[in-house]
Amino acid sequence: AASGFQSVIMAPTELLARQHFDTFVKDLSDHEISPVILISSMKASDKRMAMESISSGKAKVIIATHAVLEENIVFKNLGLVITDEQHRFGVNQRRKLSGKGEGVNILVMTATPIPRTIAAILYGDLDISQIRTMPKGRKGIHTYKCSQGERNRVLNFVEKEMKAGRQAYVVAPLIEDSESIDAKSANAIFDELQDRFNDFNIKLVHGAMKSADKDKIMQDFASGKVNLLVSTTVIEVGINVPNASVMVIENAERFGLAQLHQLRGRVGRGSDDAYCFLMCYTDSEPVSYTHLRAHET
């Protein structure tokens, strides 16, 4: 920005884009740089103002979703493209964004564990950097594999954390009960926990809901209005809640390593100890459990 170039950060969800926007507004306040946000749900008048600011070059830092890929979004002097959670975008989408400038520098980011061989195939033309250290002040995430018989103790621990003022997630592999799949559903767990934790504000979120409804619930959780969030994997990208200290993943044997890693990464973002309980209801241990413990953060 100080050199006159524009930078754009593209995120896969509006919620994540808003969180990035709030962070950049705070971090750049001392540098007299005012970030601009561009998302699909903006009012037409606000979107028009953002587009004018981008095309004139006044906007030096732009945080956006895929809305920035539209043909009528024109940059004056684009110099840097950052793609967050890059695996959620296609190659053509990333190229289209970098093609809005000349000689654009590109940075792609992900916290998803990608094997070296696959990384070499996907990013053979890019330099790969790994951040192996934890952000300052974080204590790490303790990961445990638990059986059906231990579920009550786990839920008691969740209640203890909520009474201490912290927040929790409970993740299920299904939205509704299925006759063909023997697994817990988000709807059933939500009903159960509402009865069990009736002194706390519990909400349900899943992929079949309207985007506006999902975002509202997630924003309420992020602001501390919701104590416990029951969800499907819809939360694996795009929510940052430092006060969330516990995650319970039901039927963890049904998730892969990358999903479990992404889900677990929703907790442990603050200064408190964090806990992830992998609830396994079959005799077979999830292949990913050993890998998660080996990379326990």
What are these regions (language model features)?
Residues 1-286:
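Inter-lobe coupling/hinge segments of SF2-like helicase ATPases
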Residues 290-297:
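Conserved small/polar residues in nucleotide/adenosyl-binding loops
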